[in-house]
Structures are given as C-alpha cells and as structure tokens.
A protein has these predicted regions:
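Active-site-adjacent beta-strand/loop module that shapes the phosphate/pyrophosphate-binding cleft
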Residues: 74-104, 138
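A generic structural micro-feature
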Residues: 3-5, 32, 83-91, 109-112
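Short, well-ordered beta-strand micro-motif
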Residues: 13, 94-98, 116-119
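Conserved Nudix-box catalytic region and its N-terminal flanking loop in Nudix hydrolases
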Residues: 18-56, 60
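A short coil-to-beta-strand element that immediately follows conserved catalytic motifs
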Residues: 61-70
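Conserved N-terminal beta-strand and adjoining loop/helix that marks the start
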Residues: 1-19, 39-41, 96
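Nudix hydrolase/Nudix homology domain
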Residues: 28, 104-163
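Structural motif
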Residues: 19, 65, 88-94, 115
C-alpha cells in the first residue's frame, strides 16, 4: 500500500461575528465551505503557506495573530493504476488571522470558486468540511496544547467509505 502525507495550513479569520470561508467542490461535486488555506509547497514555511493561500483564495492579506492548533486525519483510499490503495495522512496547521488589506474576490482557476463572510451562528447550517468545525472549536476553546482530543485512531486508518 502506498503512503502519502499532506501538510497544509489554514486560517480562522473572524470579525464582527462572521468567519471568512471559501467554497470548494466536494468529492461528489457538491459545493462545500472550507477554511481559506491549503497545501504547503516544498521548502515553504507553514506561516508563509497560510498567508499565500488566504490571498490566493480570498484576495485578502492577513496578519497571523496566533497558532490555534493542529488537526490530523488518516484514511485509506482506493484507486490508481494498477489498482492499489493509498494510506493518506493529512496534517493541518490552523492559525488565527486578521485581515489587514486587500479586497474580497474569488479565486480564478484554483481549488475554490467563491469566498464570503458567513455569520458564525449560520455555520452549523452550511454544507462544510469537518475542519471548519474543528477550527472553530480550537478558536473558541483555545486548548493550551493546541489539540481538541486524540485524533481518530491514527494507528488504524479509516476506509474512504467510513464516516
């Protein structure tokens, strides 16, 4: 089985009771809301990654104001030629950010198609990725160790069809 590690950095930007989110097509094509952010390029510092990604996806420049925590997941996905499974681990670094400049715009030709401020109270009703909830809990609770709870058994990866 192939192994793959993806490291990414995301920002929680909250102002006036709203959070900055981006919209991305989900695995089945259904749009879902995500945090602005994304994968690190080789040799890039995660601090620089989150600033670059927020600008690419929203048009805003941010100041990183804190490190909220880290989220990790692991899953096995089928696929490839010849057919073989991939044991995929994702490591997501979650920062707090404050918008310092730029103008809200949509990413053209990227992984997202819309950026918007969403009311914090409306987030539970949005179609969103799990990371949005994890990041909001980190932002609200501020655990001193930067972790909400032990990740879902990283020693036993979940299959892609498991909830």
């Amino acid at each position: 089985m192939r192994q793959k590690l993806r490291v990414a950095a995301y920002a929680v930007c909250v102002r006036d009771g709203q959070i900055l989110l981006a919209r991305s097509p989900g695995p089945d094509g259904t749009p879902e809301w995500v945090l602005p952010g994304g994968g690190m390029e080789h040799g890039e510092d995660p601090y620089d990654t989150v600033r670059r990604e927020v600008t690419e996806e929203t048009g805003y420049r941010i100041e990183v104001t804190g490190l909220l925590g880290v989220d990790s997941s692991r899953r096995v996905v089928p696929g490839g030629r010849p057919p073989r499974r991939t044991d995929h681990q994702g490591l997501r670094i979650i920062y707090e950010g404050e918008v310092t400049g730029g103008e809200l715009r949509y990413e053209v030709g990227g992984s997202t198609d819309l950026a918007a401020w969403q009311d914090l109270a409306a987030v539970p009703g949005l179609t969103r990725v799990r990371l949005v909830d994890v990041a909001l809990r980190l932002w609200r609770e501020r655990p001193p160790h930067g972790r909400l709870e032990a990740p879902e058994s990283l020693s036993r990866p979940r299959r892609s069809n498991e909830e």
